[in-house]
């Protein structure tokens, strides 16, 4: 990929001038002046209807953003991304989570070897294992079928699987799936306290099988299991997803119960691999395959569609417009589905760990904003929590509204109430409420002029708050796969434009190193070589 500082491009300089021209324009006027605005800024693709017309953009804005993508050689970068080039240059690795959902006849090479046949082998193993656990063919050490699955992992080995299993809960089978991630012992013991060791299967997910949190939790769970079963039965109840075969075998896991990972798949993009075994067990392999199919369809859309009609490209460029020109620092993601409760927190890792970088691909400090802060909660809960700040606060917060035309239980009364709020919020954020409208409303309620003058300023909404409306036919495994992949590719586009490496995460290393040092000090009762604040805190903790 070419390393281009975006601020040096012609398009960037023109966008700076363009921003000065339109920064004070109100979107209401944009709509009033163009009756076809919604048509011009809507993309309908398969079961996705994405309206991005409620943004502070014009056709000129879009043209300049597309010019920026061209000047940053986005098309070449996409080819490098899907072609298996080592675009994660700080670790000298390709970034090929897309290969995990590629067609079985695809040819995707890493070090001159097609990786797709190996991916297909692992998928077949996931399928067979899932089917055997779900139908009771594979049993626990006392001959009972499994009833509970516990996934032990952290970061990408947890956030993706837990998000998808909760999002697709409607499609779950009889197995109960639990997740242990935090090294907090209370979290571990609370999860396992009511489980039956005879009918519980544990999945330990760690690429290196050395991650402190995961290994500590796995060891605690094994000790709990061994209070009821002999050591030799560990192999029937513990499965590993890892590359470290020796460490896994030393733990007591049978080699046939080891599922491989690859270093060309980053943790936060790994749910499509055997890391997603818990997903396959929860919803069945056919639904897991549908999830992958949906992601592959979004991959194809991203690769093959012109940038003008390309969902990930358009959403990424609009995000850059706000981040770098309006200086917006955060984006909210609001799914109008309680099933997607964990989706914003999943995106927090995917986006913030990927693009939270301050050094560009040339090794130079950037002099422009990069990664956005991501946050959100499902609607309508979020309306009663933090929408006040979005509507009347001092910060510009672009917001994605994700909704579904059809509910899963087909309760039209509830669905209509939910979606009425979904549409109303984007309209309210667009239009706001003027002082004149407030006065008229209060007069209609028989308020005196004195009362109106006292409170009217507090009831004015400026509006002009940008939103994207992502409306999907129905929440299915396939549509969920498309949605996740949409944001994955948005991350990639932003990283290309910002000239940063999106697929490493060196920022998490220092804290780990210091934690290991402090852990040793708890045993030795020493607090040397710390700042005065940390030293005092450690002494208080150890007292």
From Swiss-Prot:
It is found in: Cytoplasm. The keyword Cytoplasm applies. It comes from the Bacteria. Pathway: Carbohydrate biosynthesis; gluconeogenesis; Carbohydrate degradation; glycolysis; D-glyceraldehyde 3-phosphate and glycerone phosphate from D-glucose: step 2/4. Keywords: Cytoplasm, Gluconeogenesis, Glycolysis, Isomerase. Disulfide bonds: none annotated. GO terms for biological process: gluconeogenesis; glucose 6-phosphate metabolic process; glycolytic process. Its EC number is 5.3.1.9. The active site is at 353 (proton donor), 384, 512. The keyword Isomerase applies. It catalyses: alpha-D-glucose 6-phosphate = beta-D-fructose 6-phosphate. One of its GO terms (molecular function) is glucose-6-phosphate isomerase activity. One of its GO terms (cellular component) is cytosol. InterPro entries: G6P_Isomerase, G6P_Isomerase_C, Phosphoglucose_isomerase_CS, SIS_dom_sf, SIS_PGI_1, SIS_PGI_2. PROSITE patterns: P_GLUCOSE_ISOMERASE_1, P_GLUCOSE_ISOMERASE_2, P_GLUCOSE_ISOMERASE_3. Catalyzes the reversible isomerization of glucose-6-phosphate to fructose-6-phosphate. NCBIfam families: PRK00179.1. PANTHER family: GLUCOSE-6-PHOSPHATE ISOMERASE. Belongs to the GPI family. This is Glucose-6-phosphate isomerase.
């Amino acid at each position: 990929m070419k390393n281009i500082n975006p601020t040096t491009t012609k398009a960037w300089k023109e966008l700076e001038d363009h921003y000065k021209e339109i920064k004070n324009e109100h979107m209401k006027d944009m709509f009033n002046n163009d009756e076809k605005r919604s048509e011009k800024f809507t993309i309908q693709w398969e079961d996705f209807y994405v309206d991005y017309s409620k943004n502070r953009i014009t056709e000129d804005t879009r043209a300049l953003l597309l010019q920026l993508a061209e000047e940053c050689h986005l098309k070449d970068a996409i080819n490098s991304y899907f072609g298996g080039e080592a675009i994660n240059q700080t670790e000298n690795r390709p970034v090929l989570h897309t290969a995990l959902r590629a067609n079985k006849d695809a040819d995707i090479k890493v070090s001159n070897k097609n990786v797709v046949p190996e991916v297909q082998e692992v998928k077949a193993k996931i399928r067979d294992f899932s089917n055997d656990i779900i139908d009771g063919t594979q049993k626990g050490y006392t001959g009972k079928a499994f009833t509970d699955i516990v996934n032990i992992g952290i970061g990408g080995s947890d956030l993706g699987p837990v998000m998808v299993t909760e999002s697709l809960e409607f499609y779950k089978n009889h197995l109960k799936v639990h997740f242990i991630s935090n090294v907090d012992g209370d979290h571990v013991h609370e999860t396992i306290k009511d489980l039956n060791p005879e009918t519980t299967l544990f999945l330990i997910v760690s690429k290196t099988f050395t991650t402190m949190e995961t290994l500590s939790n796995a060891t605690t769970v094994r000790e709990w299991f061994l209070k009821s079963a002999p050591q030799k039965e560990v192999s029937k109840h513990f499965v590993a997803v890892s590359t470290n075969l020796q460490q896994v075998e030393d733990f007591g896991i049978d080699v046939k119960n080891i599922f491989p990972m690859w270093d060309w798949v980053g943790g936060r993009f790994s749910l499509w691999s055997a890391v997603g075994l818990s997903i396959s067990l929860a919803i069945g392999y056919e639904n897991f395959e549908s999830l992958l199919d949906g992601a592959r369809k979004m991959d194809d859309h991203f690769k093959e569609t012109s940038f003008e009609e390309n969902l990930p490209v358009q959403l990424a460029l609009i995000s850059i417009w706000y981040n770098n020109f309006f200086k917006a620092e955060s984006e909210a993601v609001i799914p109008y589905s309680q099933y997607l409760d964990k989706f914003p927190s999943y995106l927090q890792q995917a986006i913030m760990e990927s693009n939270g970088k301050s050094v560009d691909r040339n090794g130079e400090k950037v002099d422009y904003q990069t990664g956005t802060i991501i946050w959100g909660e499902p609607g309508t809960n979020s309306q009663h929590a933090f929408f006040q700040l979005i509507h009347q606060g001092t910060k510009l917060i672009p917001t994605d509204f994700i909704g579904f035309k059809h509910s899963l239980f087909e309760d039209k009364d509830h669905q209509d109430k939910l979606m009425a709020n979904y549409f109303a919020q984007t309209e309210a954020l667009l239009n706001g409420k003027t002082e004149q409208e407030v006065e008229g409303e209060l007069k209609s309620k028989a308020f005196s002029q004195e009362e109106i003058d006292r409170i009217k300023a507090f009831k004015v909404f400026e509006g002009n708050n940008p939103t994207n409306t992502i409306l999907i036919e129905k929440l299915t495994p396939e549509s969920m796969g498309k949605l996740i992949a949409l944001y994955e590719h948005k991350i990639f586009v932003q990283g290309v434009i910002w000239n940063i490496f999106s697929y490493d995460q060196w920022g998490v290393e220092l804290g780990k190193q210091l934690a290991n040092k402090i852990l040793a000090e708890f045993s030795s009762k020493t607090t040397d070589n710390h700042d005065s604040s940390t030293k005092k805190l450690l002494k208080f903790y150890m007292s």
